[in-house]
Design a protein with these regions (language model features):
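Acidic/aromatic-lined carbohydrate-recognition and catalytic surfaces
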Residues: 105, 128, 249, 352-401, ...
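Conserved, mostly hydrophobic/aromatic
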Residues: 116, 272, 381, 458, ...
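Short Pro-Gly-centered flexible turn/kink motifs
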Residues: 267-286, 638, 690-698
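Active-site-adjacent "subsite" loops/lids of carbohydrate-active enzymes
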Residues: 308-310, 319-324, 366-367, 389, ...
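Catalytic domains of carbohydrate-active enzymes, especially glycoside hydrolases
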Residues: 328-350
Length: 700
């Protein structure tokens, strides 16, 4: 076959497919490239496979990129299995291993997903210590006498930890240790996760930006357990790529699920057994990665369609903090209904007194908290015109749960023959049928008993790599559990299609599209300070669809006008998770919350169609100003926030043809927002620090 061109939307993807040779991904382009040619062997293969007994002549240092002779060979088998899915099949030389690599192209977006499926066709076990879900060996090039990709290519990655989610940074490759000097190179940059907190340290995302060509490639790994990505360089003769420069040195990219290096993962593939890698997604486009988020957003919406955006009140954050009672809840319910909320969630602690963090598991209401029963509270919520919701943690059991002693050891994650303990919890294994049945029974009981319309599912433990029990490796046990759990979630969501399911992992510590393709809303953070929550909110649409991103807004009882406004504005272009002491606010403060909710109800139907954009780029956590918006048809909605910055004015670019600039919220507050003298620029003036505004930009 030779060169294979795929043209989807505005993207050209080129493969080299020739019988008896390894399949190659030659490049991803925004324009047709008639001069594309076969790459040097070992440089652009579509799959990298790590086997301990594979002949390895590669001088690579710690890299997992193998610049070595082919291991897999294309044998005349590539197929469009649907209008959007392209599959390439390769075999090992002895025909004992079959690898099918699947590219699923998004509709109306320059993006695709990628994964591989392995099948053992031989009689002997094959041990796999790692396999790429996506591999691209042509991300940039190098030519002596000119500046190198270490200088011209930037990598974007995002720190993500408890209460400090979505902290994007970008650096030149040389500043992360990749110094492309045109010789044999061991340099690499690797980001990885090794536990069930899939986003406990970093987002499973990244990007490469080439300033010479002003192009970016952006990726996400859709794993709820271990994952890794690696960027490095090598020096072949091949010089074509999407991130094309005039250099000979190439920058490669590999995306993994669990592997040996990052999580101690391995899998013994028995005769006839199959293994599927985690799914990944890749998007490309002109400009910096913030611009390419458009393509990723369209792709994500094809994974999960969310159209209903009800206003949620949750009694936890800066409110009852897990100490709810009937007496405390009833006035909050009254005030939430008056404010315009449509769902009222009773968060953790409803099942016990005292150290409720460690007694959960049976999920029976605590009569000391609710003397007439929790049903009294839930009925009252419904009478006030809202749907009731409740908190559950279903993948673990508290160490002080009364029923723990009756659960067999086989139900739990184990290492060294004993259940693994973390954060006062033991982890349940959803590969076990009885564990799934127990969770299903809990869901059925609480949904039917309390007539729920909302379930918040939390996850609060860090178990490192996983479970050894009935698994080749702990990380593979974790992967198998997670796949069983996600399948169970899909089944339960289908049973209760009218119930909204929230994903929470100590806030945003399990914020991946393995989970989010099956959940309705994500708790983005547990951050309690609205000033920090604002920057998390402004960046969160990079990780989560705006219509899935639950943003806390929690005015304190002594909140002044500006803090009430900033609380509301931070959430109004995404999803409102209202908390705080609504029943103790001043009348002025409550009126501002109510106004914000009413404004949100007028714009929310457009949020699932909006394309996020960042006129100033992703925000650092010490940014003085925040500007985040949604492109809509003929208009933009923009949140502008002045944090602790001496400057009262901010200028930022928008699209051409501005007709009008309107302040949507707060309507009665003085905010200067207008077209600047500079073409396509807007200027906003906010008198006070820690203040905000929601703008509408109307175009001609």
């Amino acid at each position: 076959m030779g060169i294979c061109e795929i043209h989807r939307n505005e993207m050209y993807v080129y493969f080299y497919l020739e019988r008896g040779e390894e399949a190659q991904l030659l490049g991803i382009f925004k324009e047709k490239n008639s001069g594309i040619k076969k790459a040097e062997q070992g440089t652009c293969r579509i799959v990298d496979l790590i086997c301990p007994d594979r002949k390895n002549y590669s001088f690579r240092g710690g890299k997992t990129f193998y610049d070595m002779p082919a291991y897999l060979f294309y044998m005349d088998s590539c197929t469009w299995t649907s209008d959007s899915r392209f599959e390439i099949v390769q075999y090992s030389e002895d025909r004992t291993l079959k690898v099918t690599t699947c590219y699923e192209f998004a509709e109306n977006a320059d993006a695709f997903s990628c994964k591989s499926i392995l099948e053992n066709l031989g009689d002997e076990e094959i041990t796999i210590e790692g396999i790429t879900s996506f591999c691209f060996g042509a991300a940039a090039g190098y030519e002596k006498g000119k500046s190198d990709p270490s200088e011209d290519v930037e990598i974007y990655y995002a720190h993500n930890t408890w209460s400090e989610e979505c902290r994007w940074v970008h650096k030149k490759l040389k500043d992360v240790g990749i110094w492309a000097y045109g010789n044999l190179c061991y340099d690499r940059f690797r980001i990885a996760n090794h536990s069930g907190f899939s986003t406990g340290e970093y987002l499973p995302m990244g990007a490469l930006y080439n300033k010479q060509t002003d192009t970016s490639v952006l990726w996400q790994i859709e794993s709820s357990t271990s994952w890794a990505y690696e960027v490095g360089c090598f020096t072949p003769e091949y010089r074509e790529s999407f991130l094309k420069t005039d250099y000979r040195q190439q920058i490669y990219l590999q995306l993994f699920g669990p592997d040996m290096e990052s999580a101690g993962w391995y899998r013994r593939l028995k005769k006839g057994e199959r293994f599927e890698t985690v799914e990944t997604a890749v998007a490309c486009g002109m400009g910096r990665p913030e611009s390419v988020m458009k393509e990723m957003t369209v792709y994500r919406r094809q994974k999960r369609k969310i159209m209903e955006l009800p206003i949620i009140f949750n009694d936890y954050m800066n409110c009852l903090m897990g100490d709810s009672t009937t007496e405390k809840l009833l006035p909050l319910i009254d005030r939430a209904a008056e404010a315009g909320c449509e769902i009222f969630v009773v968060d953790c602690g409803w099942y016990d007194t005292g150290e409720w963090q460690y007694t959960f598991g049976e999920f029976e209401e605590c009569r000391q908290r609710y003397p007439e029963g929790l049903s009294e509270v839930m009925d009252y919520i419904r009478r006030k015109g809202m749907k009731p919701g409740i908190w559950l943690e279903l993948e673990s059991v508290g160490l002080d749960c009364a029923g723990l002693q009756n659960m067999p050891k086989e139900w739990f994650f184990q290492r060294h023959g004993k259940p693994v303990i973390d954060s006062g919890r033991v982890h349940l294994d959803f590969r076990v049928k009885e564990v799934r049945e127990r969770a299903s029974a809990i869901l059925k009981r609480v949904i039917s008993r309390y007539h729920l319309g909302y379930i918040k599912i939390d996850y609060n433990l860090e178990l490192s790599c996983g479970t050894e029990f009935q698994a080749d490796s702990p990380a593979d046990g974790m992967l198998q559990h997670n796949r069983a759990y996600l399948a169970w979630l899909e089944e339960e969501h289908a049973k209760y299609s009218e119930v909204m399911f929230e994903n929470c992992g100590s806030g945003g510590l399990r914020m991946d599209y393995g989970m989010l393709s099956r959940m309705d809303i994500q708790s983005v953070s547990d951050q309690e300070d609205y000033r920090i929550m604002a920057v998390i909110a402004a960046n969160s649409a990079s990780a989560v669809l705006p219509e899935q991103a639950g943003i806390w807004t929690y005015p304190l009882k002594d909140a002044d006008r500006e803090s009430c406004i900033m609380n509301m504005a931070s959430a109004m272009l995404q999803r409102i998770h209202l908390g705080g002491n609504l029943d103790q606010l001043t009348e002025e403060g409550f009126a501002l919350i109510k106004e914000g909710i009413q404004c949100y109800k007028e714009i929310r139907k457009e949020i699932p169609e909006g394309i996020p954009f960042w006129p100033l780029g992703f925000h650092s956590f010490d940014a003085g100003w925040l500007v985040f918006g949604l492109h809509l048809e003929n208009r933009d909605l923009i949140m502008v926030c002045r944090r602790e910055d001496e400057k009262k004015r901010i200028h930022f670019p928008v699209q051409k043809g501005v007709e009008a600039v309107n302040v949507l919220y707060p309507a009665a507050e003085k905010r200067i927002a207008q077209k600047d003298g500079i073409e396509n620029d807007i200027v906003v003036e906010l008198e006070r620090e820690n203040s905000a505004v929601i703008l509408e930009i109307i175009y001609e």
